[in-house]
């Protein structure tokens, strides 16, 4: 059963400006260590960061917490599986909050066009 649904829209240009201004510090504040490995291999860093930001926002909206209430931006992450599908990761703190709320695993779908990234996330109830 569905626990919650979240969406987010991000302008890639906005994330590009933050990346240009703050550089590695921005990357370290936004990405989990596992995500930084994938980031280092990207040719379009602003697009990658915008997709991660939108996906994280959508997941915390699906949790019903937003950023705060024990879940911060580095408590949620994503790694692409063998087919390129983003798999949701939680830090131990993020997983503890999701468990306390009764949320199980999550799904996210991402797309980008015309300088925008759109993320839709679904959190499932814990079985």
Would you name each region that the model predicts?
Residues 1-127:
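Core catalytic alpha/beta fold that binds nucleotide/phospho-ligands
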């Amino acid at each position: 059963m569905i626990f919650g649904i979240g969406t987010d829209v991000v302008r890639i240009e906005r994330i590009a400006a933050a990346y240009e201004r703050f550089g590695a510090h921005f990357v370290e504040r936004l990405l989990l260590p596992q995500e930084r490995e994938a980031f280092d291999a990207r040719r379009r860093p602003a697009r990658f960061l915008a997709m991660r930001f939108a996906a994280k926002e959508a997941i915390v909206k699906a949790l019903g917490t937003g950023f705060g209430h024990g879940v911060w931006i580095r408590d949620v992450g994503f790694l692409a599986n063998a087919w390129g599908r983003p798999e949701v990761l939680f830090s131990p703190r993020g997983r503890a909050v999701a468990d306390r709320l009764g949320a199980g695993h999550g799904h996210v779908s991402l797309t980008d066009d015309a300088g925008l990234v759109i993320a839709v996330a679904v959190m499932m109830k814990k079985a």
